[in-house]
Protein backbone atom coordinates (compact mmCIF):
# COMPACT_ATOMS: atom_id res chain seq x y z
CA UNK A 1 0.00 0.00 0.00
CA UNK A 2 2.81 2.44 0.85
CA UNK A 3 4.45 1.86 -2.55
CA UNK A 4 1.16 2.44 -4.37
CA UNK A 5 0.60 5.68 -2.44
CA UNK A 6 4.10 6.87 -3.42
CA UNK A 7 3.36 6.12 -7.07
CA UNK A 8 0.02 7.89 -6.70
CA UNK A 9 1.72 11.05 -5.43
CA UNK A 10 4.37 10.96 -8.20
CA UNK A 11 1.78 10.39 -10.94
CA UNK A 12 -0.51 13.18 -9.84
CA UNK A 13 2.32 15.65 -9.28
CA UNK A 14 3.38 14.88 -12.86
CA UNK A 15 -0.19 15.45 -14.03
CA UNK A 16 -0.46 18.80 -12.23
CA UNK A 17 2.87 19.99 -13.69
CA UNK A 18 1.74 18.91 -17.16
CA UNK A 19 -1.58 20.72 -16.89
CA UNK A 20 0.23 23.81 -15.57
CA UNK A 21 2.31 23.77 -18.77
CA UNK A 22 -0.93 23.74 -20.78
CA UNK A 23 -2.25 26.69 -18.77
CA UNK A 24 0.84 28.88 -19.04
CA UNK A 25 2.23 27.81 -22.44
CA UNK A 26 -0.41 26.14 -24.60
CA UNK A 27 -3.11 28.67 -23.71
CA UNK A 28 -0.93 31.43 -25.18
CA UNK A 29 -0.44 29.60 -28.50
CA UNK A 30 -2.76 30.38 -31.39
CA UNK A 31 -5.90 28.27 -31.48
CA UNK A 32 -5.77 25.33 -33.88
CA UNK A 33 -3.09 22.93 -35.07
CA UNK A 34 -0.19 24.64 -33.29
CA UNK A 35 -1.92 24.51 -29.91
CA UNK A 36 -2.95 20.91 -30.62
CA UNK A 37 0.69 19.94 -31.21
CA UNK A 38 1.60 21.60 -27.90
CA UNK A 39 -0.90 19.51 -25.89
CA UNK A 40 -0.46 16.16 -27.68
CA UNK A 41 2.70 15.21 -25.68
CA UNK A 42 0.72 15.78 -22.48
CA UNK A 43 -2.07 13.55 -23.80
CA UNK A 44 0.52 10.89 -24.59
CA UNK A 45 1.89 11.12 -21.05
CA UNK A 46 -1.61 10.73 -19.62
CA UNK A 47 -1.95 7.41 -21.47
CA UNK A 48 1.26 6.15 -19.83
CA UNK A 49 0.61 7.19 -16.22
CA UNK A 50 -1.94 4.43 -15.33
CA UNK A 51 0.75 1.82 -16.05
CA UNK A 52 2.56 2.85 -12.86
CA UNK A 53 -0.16 1.25 -10.71
CA UNK A 54 -1.06 -2.32 -9.84
CA UNK A 55 -4.09 -1.26 -7.80
CA UNK A 56 -7.45 -1.58 -9.58
CA UNK A 57 -8.75 1.65 -8.07
CA UNK A 58 -5.68 3.77 -8.80
CA UNK A 59 -5.16 2.49 -12.34
CA UNK A 60 -8.84 2.71 -13.34
CA UNK A 61 -9.44 6.14 -11.78
CA UNK A 62 -6.24 7.57 -13.30
CA UNK A 63 -7.19 6.12 -16.68
CA UNK A 64 -10.68 7.61 -16.38
CA UNK A 65 -9.60 11.03 -15.09
CA UNK A 66 -6.46 11.54 -17.20
CA UNK A 67 -6.21 9.13 -20.13
CA UNK A 68 -9.83 9.53 -21.20
CA UNK A 69 -11.33 12.73 -19.82
CA UNK A 70 -8.31 15.05 -19.52
CA UNK A 71 -6.91 14.06 -22.93
CA UNK A 72 -10.20 14.76 -24.70
CA UNK A 73 -10.62 18.02 -22.79
CA UNK A 74 -7.15 19.20 -23.83
CA UNK A 75 -7.74 18.29 -27.48
CA UNK A 76 -10.98 20.28 -27.42
CA UNK A 77 -9.16 23.09 -25.60
CA UNK A 78 -6.73 23.29 -28.55
CA UNK A 79 -9.68 24.46 -30.69
CA UNK A 80 -11.35 26.64 -28.03
CA UNK A 81 -14.04 24.02 -27.42
CA UNK A 82 -15.19 21.88 -24.51
CA UNK A 83 -15.33 22.44 -20.74
CA UNK A 84 -11.89 24.13 -20.55
CA UNK A 85 -13.07 27.03 -22.72
CA UNK A 86 -13.25 29.83 -21.80
CA UNK A 87 -9.98 29.44 -19.91
CA UNK A 88 -10.32 29.38 -16.11
CA UNK A 89 -9.25 32.60 -14.35
CA UNK A 90 -6.57 30.84 -12.27
CA UNK A 91 -4.34 27.76 -12.37
CA UNK A 92 -6.11 25.89 -9.56
CA UNK A 93 -9.45 25.97 -11.36
CA UNK A 94 -7.83 24.98 -14.67
CA UNK A 95 -6.10 22.00 -13.04
CA UNK A 96 -9.30 20.86 -11.33
CA UNK A 97 -11.47 21.22 -14.43
CA UNK A 98 -8.86 19.31 -16.46
CA UNK A 99 -7.97 16.49 -14.08
CA UNK A 100 -11.34 15.76 -12.50
CA UNK A 101 -14.71 14.79 -14.02
CA UNK A 102 -16.37 18.10 -13.19
CA UNK A 103 -17.95 20.84 -15.26
CA UNK A 104 -19.02 24.36 -14.36
CA UNK A 105 -22.78 24.70 -14.12
CA UNK A 106 -23.70 27.62 -16.36
CA UNK A 107 -27.20 28.26 -14.95
CA UNK A 108 -27.05 27.26 -11.27
CA UNK A 109 -30.25 29.08 -10.30
CA UNK A 110 -32.34 27.06 -12.72
CA UNK A 111 -31.34 23.73 -11.15
CA UNK A 112 -30.86 24.27 -7.42
CA UNK A 113 -31.75 20.71 -6.42
CA UNK A 114 -28.79 19.25 -8.32
CA UNK A 115 -26.31 21.07 -6.10
CA UNK A 116 -27.83 19.77 -2.87
CA UNK A 117 -26.02 16.87 -1.23
CA UNK A 118 -28.62 14.30 -0.23
CA UNK A 119 -27.22 12.91 3.02
CA UNK A 120 -29.91 10.27 3.50
CA UNK A 121 -29.51 8.89 -0.02
CA UNK A 122 -25.73 8.89 0.40
CA UNK A 123 -26.00 7.01 3.71
CA UNK A 124 -28.22 4.39 2.05
CA UNK A 125 -25.65 3.96 -0.74
CA UNK A 126 -22.90 3.51 1.86
CA UNK A 127 -24.93 0.77 3.53
CA UNK A 128 -25.63 -0.95 0.20
CA UNK A 129 -21.95 -0.72 -0.70
CA UNK A 130 -20.93 -2.29 2.61
CA UNK A 131 -23.32 -5.19 2.05
CA UNK A 132 -22.05 -5.68 -1.52
CA UNK A 133 -18.43 -5.82 -0.36
CA UNK A 134 -19.16 -8.62 2.08
CA UNK A 135 -21.39 -10.56 -0.32
CA UNK A 136 -18.29 -11.19 -2.46
CA UNK A 137 -17.13 -13.58 0.27
CA UNK A 138 -19.90 -15.90 -0.92
CA UNK A 139 -19.48 -15.27 -4.66
CA UNK A 140 -18.61 -18.92 -5.31
CA UNK A 141 -22.08 -19.94 -4.11
CA UNK A 142 -24.01 -17.32 -6.12
CA UNK A 143 -25.71 -18.02 -9.46
CA UNK A 144 -24.20 -16.27 -12.49
CA UNK A 145 -27.19 -13.95 -12.92
CA UNK A 146 -26.99 -12.81 -9.29
CA UNK A 147 -23.25 -12.22 -9.60
CA UNK A 148 -23.75 -10.13 -12.75
CA UNK A 149 -26.42 -8.05 -11.01
CA UNK A 150 -24.07 -7.63 -8.05
CA UNK A 151 -21.34 -6.30 -10.36
CA UNK A 152 -23.73 -3.76 -11.88
CA UNK A 153 -24.87 -2.58 -8.43
CA UNK A 154 -21.29 -2.46 -7.15
CA UNK A 155 -20.10 -0.34 -10.07
CA UNK A 156 -22.94 2.17 -9.86
CA UNK A 157 -22.93 2.58 -6.07
CA UNK A 158 -19.14 2.88 -5.88
CA UNK A 159 -19.07 5.56 -8.59
CA UNK A 160 -21.80 7.50 -6.80
CA UNK A 161 -19.95 7.25 -3.47
CA UNK A 162 -16.64 8.38 -4.98
CA UNK A 163 -17.81 11.07 -7.40
CA UNK A 164 -20.63 12.61 -5.36
CA UNK A 165 -18.51 13.83 -2.41
CA UNK A 166 -15.71 14.77 -4.83
CA UNK A 167 -18.09 17.11 -6.63
CA UNK A 168 -19.26 18.67 -3.35
CA UNK A 169 -15.70 19.19 -2.04
CA UNK A 170 -14.46 20.71 -5.30
CA UNK A 171 -17.54 22.92 -5.52
CA UNK A 172 -16.80 24.28 -2.04
CA UNK A 173 -13.06 24.65 -2.73
CA UNK A 174 -13.53 26.40 -6.08
CA UNK A 175 -16.48 28.50 -4.97
CA UNK A 176 -18.68 27.62 -7.94
CA UNK A 177 -21.60 25.36 -8.81
CA UNK A 178 -20.77 22.12 -10.61
CA UNK A 179 -22.94 19.83 -12.67
CA UNK A 180 -23.81 16.40 -11.21
CA UNK A 181 -22.10 13.24 -12.48
CA UNK A 182 -25.24 11.10 -12.30
CA UNK A 183 -28.93 11.90 -12.51
CA UNK A 184 -30.81 8.84 -11.22
CA UNK A 185 -30.01 6.54 -14.17
CA UNK A 186 -32.47 3.93 -12.92
CA UNK A 187 -35.29 6.33 -13.92
CA UNK A 188 -34.23 6.51 -17.57
CA UNK A 189 -37.14 6.18 -20.00
CA UNK A 190 -35.03 5.51 -23.11
CA UNK A 191 -31.49 4.62 -24.13
CA UNK A 192 -30.95 8.21 -25.24
CA UNK A 193 -32.14 9.38 -21.83
CA UNK A 194 -29.92 6.85 -20.01
CA UNK A 195 -26.66 7.48 -21.88
CA UNK A 196 -27.11 11.16 -22.66
CA UNK A 197 -28.88 12.65 -19.64
CA UNK A 198 -28.43 10.35 -16.65
CA UNK A 199 -25.36 8.04 -16.71
CA UNK A 200 -21.85 9.46 -16.16
CA UNK A 201 -22.82 12.91 -17.43
CA UNK A 202 -19.29 14.32 -17.57
CA UNK A 203 -18.20 11.59 -19.99
CA UNK A 204 -21.35 12.15 -22.05
CA UNK A 205 -20.67 15.89 -22.22
CA UNK A 206 -17.04 15.51 -23.33
CA UNK A 207 -17.83 12.78 -25.87
CA UNK A 208 -20.67 14.89 -27.24
CA UNK A 209 -18.34 17.85 -27.80
CA UNK A 210 -15.29 15.86 -28.91
CA UNK A 211 -16.77 13.01 -30.94
CA UNK A 212 -20.51 13.24 -31.63
CA UNK A 213 -20.74 16.84 -32.85
CA UNK A 214 -17.68 16.69 -35.19
CA UNK A 215 -18.75 13.33 -36.68
CA UNK A 216 -22.32 14.50 -37.20
CA UNK A 217 -21.15 17.71 -38.88
CA UNK A 218 -18.71 15.79 -41.11
CA UNK A 219 -21.43 13.34 -42.19
CA UNK A 220 -24.13 15.92 -42.93
CA UNK A 221 -22.78 16.73 -46.40
CA UNK A 222 -22.60 13.20 -47.88
CA UNK A 223 -25.62 11.95 -45.86
CA UNK A 224 -28.99 13.23 -44.75
CA UNK A 225 -29.45 14.51 -41.21
CA UNK A 226 -30.87 11.20 -39.95
CA UNK A 227 -27.90 9.12 -41.09
CA UNK A 228 -25.48 11.81 -39.87
CA UNK A 229 -27.07 11.63 -36.43
CA UNK A 230 -26.87 7.82 -36.49
CA UNK A 231 -23.18 7.87 -37.45
CA UNK A 232 -22.54 10.35 -34.64
CA UNK A 233 -24.02 7.92 -32.11
CA UNK A 234 -22.20 4.92 -33.59
CA UNK A 235 -18.73 6.51 -33.60
CA UNK A 236 -19.23 8.04 -30.14
CA UNK A 237 -20.14 4.69 -28.60
CA UNK A 238 -17.29 3.01 -30.49
CA UNK A 239 -14.78 5.46 -29.02
CA UNK A 240 -16.28 4.96 -25.56
CA UNK A 241 -15.93 1.20 -25.97
CA UNK A 242 -12.28 1.52 -27.00
CA UNK A 243 -11.59 3.69 -23.96
CA UNK A 244 -13.14 1.04 -21.71
CA UNK A 245 -11.05 -1.67 -23.36
CA UNK A 246 -8.00 0.45 -22.58
CA UNK A 247 -9.05 0.74 -18.93
CA UNK A 248 -9.38 -3.04 -18.75
CA UNK A 249 -5.88 -3.37 -20.19
CA UNK A 250 -4.48 -1.02 -17.55
CA UNK A 251 -6.09 -3.15 -14.83
CA UNK A 252 -5.46 -6.68 -16.12
CA UNK A 253 -2.50 -6.17 -18.55
CA UNK A 254 -4.22 -8.74 -20.78
CA UNK A 255 -5.07 -8.68 -24.49
CA UNK A 256 -8.50 -7.06 -25.06
CA UNK A 257 -11.39 -9.40 -25.84
CA UNK A 258 -13.44 -6.62 -27.54
CA UNK A 259 -16.58 -7.73 -25.69
CA UNK A 260 -16.87 -4.33 -24.05
CA UNK A 261 -16.44 -2.54 -27.38
CA UNK A 262 -19.22 -4.72 -28.81
CA UNK A 263 -21.43 -3.79 -25.84
CA UNK A 264 -21.02 -0.08 -26.56
CA UNK A 265 -21.36 -0.47 -30.33
CA UNK A 266 -24.59 -2.44 -29.80
CA UNK A 267 -25.92 0.26 -27.49
CA UNK A 268 -24.85 2.92 -29.98
CA UNK A 269 -26.70 1.20 -32.83
CA UNK A 270 -29.80 0.72 -30.69
CA UNK A 271 -29.69 4.31 -29.37
CA UNK A 272 -29.35 5.71 -32.90
CA UNK A 273 -32.19 3.48 -34.11
CA UNK A 274 -34.34 4.44 -31.14
CA UNK A 275 -33.86 8.16 -31.82
CA UNK A 276 -34.69 7.69 -35.51
CA UNK A 277 -37.82 5.66 -34.73
CA UNK A 278 -39.02 8.13 -32.08
CA UNK A 279 -38.87 10.94 -34.64
CA UNK A 280 -41.32 9.20 -36.97
CA UNK A 281 -44.82 10.65 -37.00
CA UNK A 282 -46.45 7.22 -36.63
CA UNK A 283 -44.75 6.45 -33.32
CA UNK A 284 -45.33 9.94 -31.94
CA UNK A 285 -49.04 9.75 -32.76
CA UNK A 286 -50.07 6.13 -32.27
CA UNK A 287 -47.64 4.46 -29.89
CA UNK A 288 -47.45 6.31 -26.56
CA UNK A 289 -45.60 4.29 -23.93
CA UNK A 290 -46.09 4.66 -20.19
CA UNK A 291 -43.02 5.89 -18.33
CA UNK A 292 -43.04 2.84 -16.04
CA UNK A 293 -42.97 0.50 -19.05
CA UNK A 294 -40.27 2.49 -20.85
CA UNK A 295 -38.12 2.52 -17.69
CA UNK A 296 -38.45 -1.24 -17.35
CA UNK A 297 -37.58 -1.79 -21.02
CA UNK A 298 -34.62 0.60 -20.90
CA UNK A 299 -33.03 -0.79 -17.75
CA UNK A 300 -33.81 -4.32 -18.88
CA UNK A 301 -31.94 -3.76 -22.14
CA UNK A 302 -28.93 -2.17 -20.43
CA UNK A 303 -28.73 -4.87 -17.75
CA UNK A 304 -29.18 -7.77 -20.18
CA UNK A 305 -26.64 -6.51 -22.73
CA UNK A 306 -24.28 -5.62 -19.87
CA UNK A 307 -24.69 -9.10 -18.43
CA UNK A 308 -23.90 -10.68 -21.80
CA UNK A 309 -21.02 -8.47 -22.95
CA UNK A 310 -19.80 -6.00 -20.30
CA UNK A 311 -19.62 -7.76 -16.93
CA UNK A 312 -18.47 -11.30 -17.83
CA UNK A 313 -14.95 -9.92 -18.18
CA UNK A 314 -15.25 -8.49 -14.66
CA UNK A 315 -16.07 -11.93 -13.31
CA UNK A 316 -13.52 -13.92 -15.34
CA UNK A 317 -10.67 -11.61 -14.37
CA UNK A 318 -11.78 -11.34 -10.73
CA UNK A 319 -11.75 -7.56 -11.14
CA UNK A 320 -14.75 -6.79 -8.94
CA UNK A 321 -13.48 -9.03 -6.16
CA UNK A 322 -10.14 -7.25 -6.38
CA UNK A 323 -11.95 -3.91 -6.08
CA UNK A 324 -13.85 -5.16 -3.04
CA UNK A 325 -10.71 -6.55 -1.39
CA UNK A 326 -8.79 -3.34 -2.08
CA UNK A 327 -11.55 -1.27 -0.50
CA UNK A 328 -11.62 -3.44 2.63
CA UNK A 329 -7.81 -3.44 2.78
CA UNK A 330 -7.70 0.35 2.45
CA UNK A 331 -10.26 0.80 5.24
CA UNK A 332 -8.23 -1.52 7.45
CA UNK A 333 -5.03 0.37 6.52
CA UNK A 334 -6.59 3.71 7.50
CA UNK A 335 -7.95 2.22 10.73
CA UNK A 336 -4.50 0.91 11.69
CA UNK A 337 -2.81 4.22 10.88
CA UNK A 338 -5.28 6.22 12.95
CA UNK A 339 -5.06 3.75 15.84
CA UNK A 340 -1.38 4.70 16.20
CA UNK A 341 -2.44 8.19 17.21
Swiss-Prot record:
What keywords tag this UniProt record?
Acyltransferase, Lipid biosynthesis, Lipid metabolism, Membrane, Transferase, Transmembrane, Transmembrane helix
**A molecular function GO annotation:** long-chain-alcohol O-fatty-acyltransferase activity
This protein's name: Probable long-chain-alcohol O-fatty-acyltransferase 9
Keyword Acyltransferase (UniProt): yes
Q: Which domain of life is it from?
A: Eukaryota
The UniProt family comment states: Belongs to the wax synthase family.
Subcellular localization: Membrane
Q: What coarse category fits the chief subcellular location reported for this protein?
A: membrane
Q: What's the stated role of this polypeptide?
A: Catalyzes the final step in the synthesis of long-chain linear esters (waxes).
Q: How does it sit in the membrane?
A: Multi-pass membrane protein
What is the protein's species of origin?
Arabidopsis thaliana
Amino acid sequence: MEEELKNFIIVWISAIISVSYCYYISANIKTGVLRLFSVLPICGLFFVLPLFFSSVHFSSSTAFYLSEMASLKLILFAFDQGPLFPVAPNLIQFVCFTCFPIKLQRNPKSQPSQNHFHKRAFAIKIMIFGVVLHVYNYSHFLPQTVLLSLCFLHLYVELEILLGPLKVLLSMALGCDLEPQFNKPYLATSLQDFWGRRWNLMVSSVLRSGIYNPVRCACQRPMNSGWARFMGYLVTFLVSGLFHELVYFYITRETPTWEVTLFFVLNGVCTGTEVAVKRTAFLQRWWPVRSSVSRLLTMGFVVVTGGLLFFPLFIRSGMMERRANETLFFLDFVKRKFSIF
